[in-house]
Amino acid sequence: MRSKRSTKRTKRASATQLYQTCKAAGTCPSDVIPKIEHTTIADQILRYGSMGVFFGGLGIGSGSGTGGRTGYVPLSTRPSTVSEASIPIRPPVSIDPVGPLDPSIVSLVEESGIVDVGAPAPIPHPPTTSGFDIATTADTTPAILDVTSVSTHENPTFTDPSVLQPPTPAETSGHLLLSSSSISTHNYEEIPMDTFIVSTNNENITSSTPIPGVRRPARLGLYSKATQQVKVIDPTFLSAPKQLITYENPAYETVNAEESLYFSNTSHNIAPDPDFLDIIALHRPALTSRRNTVRYSRLGNKQTLRTRSGATIGARVHYYYDISSINPAGESIEMQPLGASATTTSTLNDGLYDIYADTDFTVDTPATHNVSPSTAVQSTSAVSAYVPTNTTVPLSTGFDIPIFSGPDVPIEHAPTQVFPFPLAPTTPQVSIFVDGGDFYLHPSYYMLKRRRKRVSYFFTDVSVAA
């Protein structure tokens, strides 16, 4: 009969058991040695990665399951706290028991005696002597005395300071006598206070404390945007401003115009001046300077509207009266016209635009050239060539602009060679510059000159003639 083969697989030994037997023989599988010696890929990642990342105290990868430094805390409960043991309060001294027959009032004066805290230190008394003994001898030899002087100086830096002990505390209902030494020695130097020079003149004394009552004058705010500006023409505003606000009887009322004036509700009255209607307060005057004038100003408050609660609403008005004007300093200078009128006609050869050309030689009969818009006349000498002289060029402006005389420009020239036969020049040898008025540029100057393209002959083998 054929027996059934067992299909159960035999378990292999663990890696630790295999490593102990196969390490010496060198027959260990490839996965046993790295696992036991911790040289797997995962171990190498943890080894080199721990150099840059630190997870100390968190319990990651340790397998201990402690939950880190603080441990695991259940969500539903709180960690228990240790309560301190309560210590009963007891008196510091023992209390004697009191019997039922003992009196309730204890007399402390009878039992208490005189408490001697301490006896004072004895004061040494100098010894009493009867004097010096005088002995007389017949020896005439002079006596030699050996005298040595010793001086001692105490350094307070290295001397211990004297400490004054506090008195001993004591409490009793009888007689109390305290005795302690209250005399102490010190090593510091006592310097008497001296009186410096005392000045009796209080006018020259300067103090850093500000003088009360002297302050910087505040700005009046007369020309703010919220203030209405009203100019007063009536000169009564200077002496009796109350007459412009309400009717008064001068026989019974005397008002100082330099003080603030307050009025009751004058809405049912008509003011003599309509500019002062509904005025309830007119403040003190002020003299100011505004735009070369001396100005007399007063601020006033109006009561235009009154609410049921008693609040008043009104504008703030600045009343001013210009007393006099201030003339600007300096003498006035009469201005002279610089140019002629556009309707003035100009004459030819009136001295405008004269250009002088100085020569180094003298001629007998110089030639004169007069150039005009209509004709041009030229004359030359029969002996010498063309000699430039004063040339007058009247320039006409197309926009009737006044023409002013320009400066004289001297031009120097080299001496001209004299030929054996007369030579009439075709063009003048002197450049004439004209300044003044307006001009038109010649159309040929509008075209820009075309720059010649330069070609480099560095790589050529031929020479170019200059």
Curated annotation (Swiss-Prot):
Major subcellular location class: virion
Gene Ontology cellular-component terms listed: host cell; host cell endosome; host cell Golgi apparatus; host cell nucleus; viral capsid
Key words of the record: Capsid protein, Cytoplasmic inwards viral transport, Disulfide bond, DNA-binding, Host endosome, Host Golgi apparatus, Host nucleus, Host-virus interaction, Late protein, Microtubular inwards viral transport, Phosphoprotein, Viral penetration into host nucleus, Virion, Virus entry into host cell
Example of a GO MF term: DNA binding
GO biological process assignments: microtubule-dependent intracellular transport of viral material towards nucleus; symbiont entry into host cell; viral penetration into host nucleus
Compartments, record wording: Virion; Host nucleus; Host early endosome; Host Golgi apparatus
Disulphide-bridged cysteine pairs: 22-28
Subunit comment: Interacts with major capsid protein L1. Interacts with E2; this interaction inhibits E2 transcriptional activity but not the DNA replication function E2. Interacts with host GADD45GIP1. Interacts with host HSPA8; this interaction is required for L2 nuclear translocation. Interacts with host importins KPNB2 and KPNB3. Forms a complex with importin alpha2-beta1 heterodimers via interaction with the importin alpha2 adapter. Interacts with host DYNLT1; this interaction is essential for virus intracellular transport during entry.
Purpose: Minor protein of the capsid that localizes along the inner surface of the virion, within the central cavities beneath the L1 pentamers. Plays a role in capsid stabilization through interaction with the major capsid protein L1. Once the virion enters the host cell, L2 escorts the genomic DNA into the nucleus by promoting escape from the endosomal compartments and traffic through the host Golgi network.
HAMAP family assigned: PPV_L2 (MF_04003)
Name the record gives this protein: Minor capsid protein L2
Species the sequence originates in: Human papillomavirus 31
Lineage: Viruses, Monodnaviria, Shotokuvirae, Cossaviricota, Papovaviricetes
Gene: L2
